C-alpha cells in the first residue's frame, strides 16, 4: 500500500554575493527577506528578479538571481521606488483634501518626487502642510498597495468613467497605444496608471516634507494645459528627514545664486531677460581662468581653436536634425526678407556641432590629417521653461566647452580614451573626486527616435564600451538615454553635500558624417567616412561654475579666486610699504587688493573673511621695519611671518600647482 506524500517544490535563488538558498516555489520577495532576517524584512521595499525590478510581493517560481531592495540600496534604486510611491501617496492625499483634482505625471527625481496636478485651486504653503499631515494619516492607515494588470481598452474606460482623469486616458491612447495590457496601482480608493514597482504598504512612509510649488505644462509643452507641480521628499524614518533638512539648510547657505550676489560673481536682470546671466568682473575672472586652464590643456593634447557665429540658417539645423528634434526647446526662428524679397530664417544657435562640421568639410582631408580635434567655447541658446530656470545651473544662454574630434574608425577607441582621460583630469584638478560614469545607450525598441541604422548604433555602442573598459572606469548602463545621433558617456560628480550633477560628456557619432557628407581620402585613394566624437568636460561653463560655487561654498582654490590676496595695512604710516608689497604681488601675477581705508584691522580682516579671500597679508610697523609680512589664511587664521621672497614663492607655487 502506498502513501501520497505532499512534497512542496523548491527553487534555488542566488544572491548578489554568490550565495544560494533553496526556497519554496512561489515564495514572495518578502518571504525571502524574512528567511534571511527580520531586520531585512522590515526594511525591504522591492525585489530584483533576474535583473528586473518587481514588487516585494512578486512570487519567485523558478531558479533565479534575486536582490532585496532597501531604501539605502546602492545606486539609489530603493530611494527612487520609495519616492515614486510617496508621489502616489501625495496624490491620494490631494485627492482626499481637494476632490476633483486631476493628475499628470508624478515621478521620482534625484532628491525626492513631484506630481503635476490640474486644479482650479491655487496651492500655497499652508496647503502643503495640510497635504503632509494627510499623507502621514494615509501612512497610519497602513493601506496595502496593490498592482493590477488590466487590458488597455478596459483601462481607458476605467480612467475615463471611474477616475474621470483625461490625462491618464491620453497616455493610454497615445504613449501606450501599442500595449495590450497596462498596470494600475491601487491604494484604497486611489488608483494610478504606473509600471511600478511600488512599496507594499503605505505604512513604510514615516516622514515627509513638501518643499516647493512651481508652474508646469502638461507633458512639458507650453502650448498645452498649465499645471501646478508640487515637489516633496519622504523617508522611512523621522531621523532621516531631520538629516536631510539639515543638508538643505547647508545647501541654502551654499546656493550659488545667493553666493553669486554676495561675492559679486554674476547677476540676473529682468531687463535682460530670464535665464540670461551677466558675468560681473569677479565671476568673469573665474570663468576666464577655467577657460585658460582647459585651452592650455587642449593645446598640449593637439586641439585647434575655432570660433563660430551665434546664429545660423535654419536649413543648417534641419540638415543636422537639431531642428525640429529640439524645436520645443529652441527660440522661435528669426525671419526676414533679403534684397530680392526671398524669405530667410535663422535660429539662435542651439548647438555648435553643425558649424564645426562645415569647417571640416571646407577642405579636402587625407587619412594622414586625422584625427582633427576642433575646440570652441561656443555660446548656445535654449528656450527653457521659466519654471525650470535656476541661476547659472539652468540658463537659456550658456557657453559650452565644445570639441569635435574627426577620426578614422581605427582611431576611434584611442580618441574616446583620450577624451575620457581629459575629462577625468579636469574634474580631479577641480576637486571633484567622487565621479560616476553612465553609458547612455539607445533604446532598440524605439529606433525611430534616433538617427542612423541599428547596425551603426551597434558599432558605436561597441566602441564606447571598449573604450570605457580599457580606461578601467566603473559605469552603469542607461538604456534609452543616448543622444539622437549616438551613444554617450556621461560623467556625474558628487558634490560636498553628496548631491549628484551630470557635467561632462563624451559622445560617439556615426550619423552626422552621413548627413553632412563628410569624408577623407584613405590610403587606397578612395573617400571614407570619418567618425565624430563630441566632447565637453565642463559641459556648460555656467552650469559647471554654479556647481563649483556650491561645492566649494565660494571658497575657491587660490588659482581660481577672483581676489587671491588682501593686503591690509594697520596704520597710515605703513601705507608706502603696503603699496610696495601690493605691487610686488601684482608684478608676479597674483590678483591682490590693497585696503588703505582708515578702518580698524579687525574690520578689514572680517570683511576679507566674508569675501572668502584666500590670503590676508597684515602689515604693521614691525613688518615694515623688518620688510616682512604677517600672513593669515581664510578660515585657518594666523600663519606666521614671511619674507617677501618666501611669500611670492609660496603663492606662485600654489597657483602653478592648482592646489
From Swiss-Prot:
Report the domain of life of the source organism: Bacteria
Compartments in which it is found: Cytoplasm
Q: Example GO biological process term? A: threonyl-tRNA aminoacylation
Cofactor(s) listed = Zn(2+)
Which reactions appear under catalytic activity for this entry? tRNA(Thr) + L-threonine + ATP = L-threonyl-tRNA(Thr) + AMP + diphosphate + H(+)
Q: Where is this region: Catalytic?
A: 255-557
Recite the UniProt keywords alphabetically: Aminoacyl-tRNA synthetase, ATP-binding, Cytoplasm, Ligase, Metal-binding, Nucleotide-binding, Protein biosynthesis, RNA-binding, tRNA-binding, Zinc
- Which SUPFAM superfamilies does the UniProt record give? Class II aaRS ABD-related, Class II aaRS and biotin synthetases, TGS-like, ThrRS/AlaRS common domain
- TGS domain segment(s): 7-70
Question: Per its record, what are the GO molecular function terms?
Answer: ATP binding; metal ion binding; threonine-tRNA ligase activity; tRNA binding
Q: Which GO terms describe its cellular component?
A: cytoplasm
PROSITE patterns recorded: AA_TRNA_LIGASE_II (PS50862), TGS (PS51880)
Q: How is the cofactor bound?
A: Binds 1 zinc ion per subunit.
Q: Which CDD domains match?
A: TGS_ThrRS, ThrRS_anticodon, ThrRS_core
- EC no. given is 6.1.1.3
The protein's enzyme class = ligase
Residues that bind Zn(2+), according to the entry?
353, 404, 534
Q: What does this protein do?
A: Catalyzes the attachment of threonine to tRNA(Thr) in a two-step reaction: L-threonine is first activated by ATP to form Thr-AMP and then transferred to the acceptor end of tRNA(Thr). Also edits incorrectly charged L-seryl-tRNA(Thr).
PANTHER family linked: THREONINE--TRNA LIGASE, CHLOROPLASTIC_MITOCHONDRIAL 2, THREONINE-TRNA LIGASE
Family of the protein in this entry: Belongs to the class-II aminoacyl-tRNA synthetase family.
State the oligomer form and interacting partners.
Homodimer.
Name recorded for this polypeptide? Threonine--tRNA ligase
Q: What is the species of this protein?
A: Chlorobium phaeobacteroides (strain BS1)
Amino acid at each position: 500500500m502506498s502513501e501520497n506524500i505532499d512534497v512542496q517544490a523548491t527553487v534555488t535563488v542566488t544572491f548578489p554575493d554568490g550565495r544560494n538558498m533553496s526556497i519554496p516555489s512561489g515564495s514572495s520577495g518578502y518571504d525571502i527577506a524574512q528567511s534571511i532576517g527580520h531586520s531585512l524584512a522590515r526594511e525591504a521595499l522591492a525585489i530584483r528578479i533576474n535583473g528586473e525590478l518587481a514588487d516585494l510581493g512578486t512570487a519567485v517560481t523558478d531558479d533565479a538571481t534575486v536582490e532585496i531592495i532597501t531604501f539605502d540600496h546602492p545606486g539609489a534604486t530603493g530611494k527612487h521606488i520609495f519616492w515614486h510611491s510617496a508621489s502616489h501617496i501625495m496624490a491620494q492625499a490631494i485627492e482626499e483634501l481637494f476632490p476633483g483634482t486631476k493628475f499628470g505625471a508624478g515621478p521620482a527625481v534625484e532628491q525626492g518626487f513631484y506630481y503635476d496636478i490640474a486644479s482650479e485651486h491655487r496651492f500655497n504653503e499652508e496647503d502643503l502642510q495640510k497635504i503632509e499631515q494627510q499623507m502621514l494619516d494615509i501612512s497610519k492607515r497602513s493601506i496595502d498597495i496593490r498592482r493590477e494588470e488590466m487590458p488597455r481598452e478596459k483601462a481607458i474606460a476605467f480612467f475615463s468613467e471611474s477616475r474621470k482623469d483625461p490625462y491618464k486616458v491620453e497616455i493610454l491612447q497615445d504613449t501606450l497605444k501599442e500595449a495590450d495590457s497596462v498596470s494600475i496601482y491601487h491604494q484604497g480608493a486611489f488608483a494610478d496608471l504606473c509600471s511600478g514597482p511600488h512599496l507594499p504598504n503605505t505604512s513604510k512612509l514615516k516622514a515627509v516634507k513638501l518643499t516647493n510649488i512651481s508652474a508646469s505644462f502638461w507633458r512639458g509643452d507650453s502650448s498645452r494645459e498649465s499645471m501646478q507641480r508640487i515637489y516633496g521628499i519622504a523617508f522611512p524614518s523621522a531621523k532621516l528627514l531631520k538629516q536631510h533638512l539639515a543638508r538643505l539648510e547647508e545647501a541654502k547657505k551654499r546656493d550659488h545664486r545667493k553666493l553669486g550676489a554676495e561675492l559679486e560673481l554674476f547677476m540676473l536682470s529682468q531687463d535682460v531677460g530670464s535665464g540670461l546671466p551677466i558675468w560681473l568682473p569677479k565671476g568673469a575672472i573665474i570663468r576666464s581662468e577655467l577657460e585658460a586652464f582647459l585651452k592650455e590643456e587642449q593645446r598640449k593634447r593637439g586641439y585647434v581653436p575655432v570660433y563660430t557665429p551665434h546664429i545660423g540658417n535654419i536649413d543648417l539645423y534641419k540638415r543636422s536634425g537639431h531642428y525640429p528634434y529640439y524645436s520645443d526647446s529652441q527660440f522661435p526662428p528669426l525671419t526676414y526678407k533679403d534684397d530680392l524679397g526671398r524669405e530667410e530664417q535663422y535660429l539662435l544657435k542651439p548647438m555648435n556641432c553643425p558649424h564645426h562640421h562645415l569647417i571640416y568639410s571646407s577642405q579636402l582631408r587625407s587619412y594622414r590629417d586625422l584625427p582633427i580635434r576642433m575646440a570652441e567655447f561656443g555660446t548656445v541658446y535654449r528656450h527653457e521653461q521659466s519654471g525650470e530656470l535656476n541661476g547659472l545651473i539652468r540658463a537659456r544662454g550658456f557657453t559650452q566647452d565644445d570639441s569635435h574630434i574627426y577620426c578614422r574608425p581605427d582611431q576611434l577607441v584611442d580618441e574616446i580614451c583620450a577624451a575620457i582621460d581629459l575629462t577625468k583630469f579636469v574634474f580631479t584638478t577641480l576637486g571633484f573626486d567622487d565621479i560616476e560614469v553612465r553609458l547612455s545607450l539607445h533604446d532598440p525598441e524605439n529606433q525611430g527616435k534616433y538617427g542612423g541604422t541599428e547596425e551603426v548604433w551597434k558599432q558605436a555602442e561597441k566602441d564606447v564600451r571598449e573604450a570605457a573598459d580599457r580606461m578601467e572606469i566603473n559605469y552603469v548602463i542607461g538604456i534609452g538615454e543616448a543622444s539622437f545621433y549616438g551613444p554617450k558617456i556621461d560623467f556625474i560628480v558628487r558634490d560636498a553635500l553628496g548631491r549628484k550633477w551630470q557635467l561632462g560628456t563624451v559622445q560617439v557619432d556615426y550619423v552626422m558624417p552621413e548627413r553632412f557628407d563628410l569624408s577623407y581620402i584613405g590610403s587606397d585613394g578612395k573617400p571614407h567616412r570619418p567618425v565624430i566624437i563630441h566632447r565637453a568636460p565642463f559641459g556648460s561653463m555656467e552650469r559647471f561654475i554654479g556647481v563649483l560655487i556650491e561645492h566649494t561654498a565660494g571658497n575657491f582654490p587660490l588659482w581660481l579666486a577672483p581676489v587671491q590676496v588682501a593686503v591690509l595695512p594697520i596704520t597710515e604710516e605703513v601705507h608706502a610699504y603696503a603699496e610696495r608689497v601690493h605691487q610686488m604681488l601684482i608684478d608676479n601675477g597674483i590678483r591682490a587688493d590693497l585696503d588703505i581705508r582708515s578702518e580698524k584691522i579687525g574690520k578689514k580682516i572680517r570683511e576679507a573673511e566674508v569675501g572668502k579671500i584666500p590670503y590676508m597679508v597684515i602689515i604693521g610697523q614691525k613688518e615694515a621695519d623688518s620688510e616682512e609680512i604677517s600672513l593669515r589664511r581664510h578660515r585657518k587664521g594666523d600663519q606666521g611671518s614671511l619674507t617677501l621672497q618666501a611669500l611670492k614663492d609660496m603663492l606662485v607655487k600654489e597657483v602653478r600647482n592648482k592646489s
